[in-house]
Design a protein with these regions (language model features):
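Conserved NTP-binding catalytic cores of kinases and kinase-like/nucleotidyltransferase enzymes
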Residues: 1-101, 217-221, 302, 306-312
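An alpha-helical support segment within catalytic cores of ATP-dependent transferases
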Residues: 27-36, 149-206, 217, 263
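A conserved alpha-helical element in kinase catalytic cores
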Residues: 32, 65-115, 119, 123-144, ...
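Generic structural marker for isolated residues within well-ordered, non-membrane alpha-helices
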Residues: 35, 141, 258
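Active-site acidic catalytic loop and adjacent metal/ATP-binding pocket
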Residues: 50-51, 55-63, 70-71, 104, ...
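A glycine-centered beta->alpha junction motif in the catalytic cores
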Residues: 64, 76, 94-95, 110-130, ...
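Active-site Asp-x-Gly
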Residues: 216-269, 293, 299-302, 307
Length: 312
């Protein structure tokens, strides 16, 4: 692989659509110059991008001393996403297989840029049974959960309020692609989780624990990438696992997954279930907006099926 750096920058449709949805046209136009500046300042070679990136421009890179790395350039958007990710990596990152999150070599908050260790295959690429994936997701997420009161990260209550606003606005913008009952259920669950937030119990959570965000570590084990970063109840991360695999969720009793996750991690099943309800609608709408199908439609179909159902 040549990593001398692209004269032209290839951006996937998913990343391009997400950038356009965020109003980041100037960022897209400026990517070649941004990459050239980082190559010079960090003394790195930059190769082709990864095809499966969704939240940022992510490319293969190599340091001056030959170490394999990854260059990640965050899409500019409201909410300080780059600063939050950098904060999580500074708090929870490090060397060795016991670290649950990717190691960060360099960062530039102003440019939304990070130079990260290059990891192996994603959990999705390994083709493991869903039960094995859930065990690995839980075990990896647990290694991140810790007190981080002075991190400056948003709280679970703030995220719950943001999700409610996002659901309301995006549902209307897209012409109501799921039922009003599903949206009402998600908004009710979001309000419950906002009311339940407790600063004293809140821990650092990843915020997007799914099978594409867990990769094989170079020294064994698994590591998370792409943290959103919140100070929230740990159940939030398990709510993401509830959100994922929507087709498989409906093949049995959907409540069983929430109960298993709660028992596995010693947490509250109702909180896990409610975060899953909120995230399923929010993410289904987002994926529909950026054209990532069929999973967007599958999430919304699952949300319609589960509308009004509380954990019993």
């Amino acid at each position: 692989m040549s990593e001398s750096g692209p004269a032209q920058v290839s951006v996937s449709d998913v990343v391009r659509n997400k950038a356009l949805a965020a109003g980041a046209e100037r960022w897209l136009d400026g990517l070649p110059g941004l990459i050239a500046g980082l190559k010079r300042d960090w003394r790195i070679a930059v190769g082709p991008p990864f095809d499966d990136a969704t939240e940022a421009y992510v490319a293969r890179a190599r340091t001056e001393d030959g170490r394999a790395a990854v260059l990640k350039l965050m899409i500019p958007r409201p909410g300080d996403a780059a600063q939050h990710e950098i904060a999580v990596l500074r708090i929870a990152g490090g060397e060795g297989p016991d670290q649950g999150i990717v190691r960060m070599f360099r960062y530039d908050s102003d440019r939304g840029a990070m130079l990260l260790e290059r990891l192996g295959r994603s959990l999705d690429q390994l083709g493991l049974p869903i039960g094995s994936r859930h065990e690995i997701l839980c075990a990896t997420a647990e290694r991140i959960w810790r007190p981080a009161a002075r991190s400056g990260l948003p709280t679970g209550a703030e995220k719950g309020r943001w999700l409610a606003r996002h659901i309301t606005a995006t549902w209307a913008e897209l012409g109501r692609p799921c039922s009003a009952r599903a949206v009402e259920h998600a908004l009710t669950c979001a309000a419950r989780r906002v009311a339940a937030h407790d600063d004293a119990r809140a821990v650092l959570v990843h915020g997007d624990v799914h099978q594409w965000n867990v990769l094989e570590g170079r020294d064994g084990g698994y590591k998370l990438i792409d943290p959103d970063g919140l100070l929230a109840e740990a159940e939030y991360d398990l709510g993401i696992i509830m959100r994922e695999d929507p087709v498989e969720l409906l093949t049995g009793d959907p409540c069983d997954r929430a109960r298993w996750l709660a028992e596995r991690c010693g947490l509250d099943a109702t909180a896990i279930w409610e975060w899953g309800i909120v995230e399923r609608v929010s993410t289904g709408l987002l994926l529909t907006k950026i054209g990532l199908q069929p999973v967007g439609a599958q999430m919304l179909a699952a949300a319609d099926h589960l509308a009004g159902l509380d954990l019993t």
